[in-house]
Amino acid sequence: MLDMEAIIQNLQQEMNRGTLVLAVLTQMDQQQYGYSLIQALNDEGIMVEQNTLYPLLRRIEKQGLLESIWQVEGNRPRRYYKISELGIKVRKELIKEWKLLEKSMANLIGGEV
């Protein structure tokens, strides 16, 4: 049986996974490469690792939510991502859903903290 800390850690990971797409889409109005996006998210308290972010970026690019281009800076090629028109529309809808969920959760939780 898992102890309480392990259970909480697992549940926190599940919650974070569910919000990561929206978190990424909110940061993509300007071109970003993977590492700069990790830093931006971490600065806002969304802790994400490379092995989580890069597959997510590829997946949501394949869905048409992001566009990417390769650019060479110095000697290193970097893949830069930017939100697509579809991504902007999806982000807007996800934000609406987030706000509804936030309101519902606030009602459910009430003063419990």
How would you describe each model-predicted region?
Residues 77-95:
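Basic, amphipathic "hinge/linker" alpha-helix immediately C-terminal to the N-terminal HTH DNA-binding motif
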Residues 50, 76-77:
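Short, aromatic/basic-enriched loop-to-helix "N-cap" motif that marks the start
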